[in-house]
Amino acid sequence: MTNXRKTHPLAKIVNNSFIDLPAPSNISAWWNFGSLLGVCLILQILTGLFLAMHYTSDTATAFSSVTHICRDVNYGWIIRYMHANGASMFFICLFMHVGRGLYYGSYVFMETWNIGIVLLFATMATAFMGYV
């Protein structure tokens, strides 16, 4: 009797991608933080775009525009909180990702490590400019 997940055309795609994934056995949960960084970044970009549609940066109306987002925009309060908490989650995932690289000795791959350091500094500079 043949296994349906290995013979059915659609189930075969799912099986090869998720169940019988050709990955080394030493991959742990620490390797998920790179993917979570991508998810957090997409969340930040999308919620930032939706918030920017209603935000005004004028000093006289900035606070009232944030109040408008929270009270008058449909689900504006949750978009604002997702954007604020997504930034914190992004940096938690970022530091866990760097910590995993330090723990497993990824710094020996100099080109990859240096690109990562440049991206880390660029991310920190962008976040600083967002707070200022």
From Swiss-Prot:
Its main location: mitochondrion. One of its GO terms (molecular function) is metal ion binding. The keyword Cell membrane does not apply. It is found in: Mitochondrion inner membrane. The chain crosses the membrane at residues 33-53, 77-98, 113-132. It is a multi-pass membrane protein. Heme b b566 binds at H97. One of its GO terms (cellular component) is mitochondrial inner membrane. Gene3D superfamilies: Cytochrome Bc1 Complex, Chain C. Keywords: Electron transport, Heme, Iron, Membrane, Metal-binding, Mitochondrion, Mitochondrion inner membrane, Respiratory chain, Transmembrane, Transmembrane helix, Transport, Ubiquinone. GO terms for biological process: mitochondrial electron transport, ubiquinol to cytochrome c. The keyword Chaperone does not apply. It holds the Pfam family Cytochrome_B. Its cofactor is heme b. Binds 2 heme b groups non-covalently. Heme b b562 binds at H83. Heme 1 (or BL or b562) is low-potential and absorbs at about 562 nm, and heme 2 (or BH or b566) is high-potential and absorbs at about 566 nm. PANTHER family: CYTOCHROME B. The cytochrome bc1 complex contains 11 subunits: 3 respiratory subunits (MT-CYB, CYC1 and UQCRFS1), 2 core proteins (UQCRC1 and UQCRC2) and 6 low-molecular weight proteins (UQCRH/QCR6, UQCRB/QCR7, UQCRQ/QCR8, UQCR10/QCR9, UQCR11/QCR10 and a cleavage product of UQCRFS1). This cytochrome bc1 complex then forms a dimer. Belongs to the cytochrome b family. Component of the ubiquinol-cytochrome c reductase complex (complex III or cytochrome b-c1 complex) that is part of the mitochondrial respiratory chain. The b-c1 complex mediates electron transfer from ubiquinol to cytochrome c. Contributes to the generation of a proton gradient across the mitochondrial membrane that is then used for ATP synthesis. This is Cytochrome b. The gene is MT-CYB.
